[in-house]
């Protein structure tokens, strides 16, 4: 499963006021146990910065272990597991997912 498919399947969107939304996607959990937050939408480090069906770039946050494919996007390179990674190309996110064995949908925490 690619990240855009994951976002479409699991994201929840809440309309706050006309023209403003809040969106949340549960953590991506990979088959080898690697986890990361991947978010896209208004007020997030994504492209586009709207609620759409497909993204070019998304915000990654708080990976469970350091991931070399993400390092150059880190806001804080001194705390790679406790920072946000802005505007990460979805192709890179897909590479990270593939590197870690794909998404384990049985472990997705749907609230």
Predicted regions and their residues:
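Low-complexity intrinsically disordered segments
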Residues: 67-111
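Compositionally biased, intrinsically disordered low-complexity regions enriched in proline and serine
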Residues: 7, 11, 46, 56, ...
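Generic structural motif recognizing short loop/turn segments at the entrances and edges of beta-strands
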Residues: 2-3, 22-26, 32-34, 54-59, ...
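Generic hydrophobic secondary-structure signal
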Residues: 28, 34-38, 45-46, 60-62, ...
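Amphipathic, interaction-prone secondary-structure segments
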Residues: 15-55
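Extreme N-terminal leader/activation tails
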Residues: 1-20
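Acidic, aromatic-enriched beta-alpha/helix-loop junctions
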Residues: 41-80
């Amino acid at each position: 499963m690619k990240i855009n498919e994951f976002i479409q399947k699991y994201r929840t969107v809440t309309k706050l006021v006309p023209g403003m939304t809040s969106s949340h996607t549960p953590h991506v959990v990979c088959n080898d146990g690697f986890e990361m937050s991947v978010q896209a939408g208004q007020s997030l480090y994504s492209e586009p910065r709207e609620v759409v069906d497909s993204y070019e770039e998304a915000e990654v946050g708080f990976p469970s272990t350091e991931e070399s494919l993400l390092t150059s996007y880190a806001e804080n390179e001194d705390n790679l597991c406790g920072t946000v990674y802005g505007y990460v190309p979805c192709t890179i996110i897909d590479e990270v997912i593939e590197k870690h064995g794909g998404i384990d949908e049985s472990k997705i925490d749907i609230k």
